[in-house]
Amino acid sequence: SRKSNFIALKRGRYWRFGLRPPFINKKEVRKLKIKKFLYSQKVAPYVFVIPFILSFAIFWIYPLCSSVFMSFEKITPLETKFVALENYKKLLSDTVFLTAIKNSATYMFWTLVLLIPFPMLFAVLMDSNLVKAKGVWKAVLYMPALTSVVISGTLFRLMFTEYSTGQMNKLVMALGMEPFKWLKVGWTGMAALLVLACWRWTGVNMLYFLSGLKSIDTSLYEAAEIDGANGWQKFRYVTLPLLRPTTIYVLTISIYAGLAMFLESYMLWAGNNSPKNIGLTIVGYLYKRGIEKNDMGYACAVGMVLLVIALVINIVQLVCNGTFKREED
């Protein structure tokens, strides 16, 4: 034991002065050099980042590049043929695809109208002293987000059924009106989708805004009160400007979620075949062409158009919000 301690101490002294101990074999020297290299300040950060880079490249970069190349091909079970821009030319005259774009744009617009101001209002109420049992209300509003889309979509399909046994038609009949064919008419079908979206995501967006409100310094509100500001003025000139980063984030993810919506529509109409395509979205059309009709090249072209639309909308939104402007000195 004393001998091993002495050898270890002696080895440490040798390495401290950059000398090689004469009694260490080459294999041990190689291990020490590798260990020293990996634990150096220049290399260690990259070692920890490598797993993320590999996973990002495998699961994001490779599929994206593959989809770009596949969008210029006609892919069948028997052969793959390069067709250049043929898939994109077909998209321009595809009326079903244009209907899907219209449905996705309408859904995205109304989700922005409903799922930004109302969750912000709920967050302000939860942050004030006007509401009691705040924990209960937060749980009630957030619990729908924990429900599976498959289950919630099935429940809403039963609620909005065209028969008189549906909950929504019972409510309509109680008001003295005739039952609606909710999921067979364009505007009522979109209304059902929006009710499902608001039910699921109001609590999530409320928590985003609530976290933004918690980061605002309360001394700003106290200073506003001293200056004679009322509740609306404090909200207008203190809360809204300081909630801008949170609002931009919620707006960005809402745009993406609106364009990428698929499963809610799929479950609400029990498949991807809504009457006259009133519930067909861009991702739903991508699924129909790629999976149901086995036309992967055309489906990839649909996906590339969706990517471009999402990028353009987000860039325009960020430019309008002044995100890219440099701060003036």
Please tell me what each predicted stretch does.
Residues 2-9:
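Extreme N-terminal basic, low-complexity initiation segments
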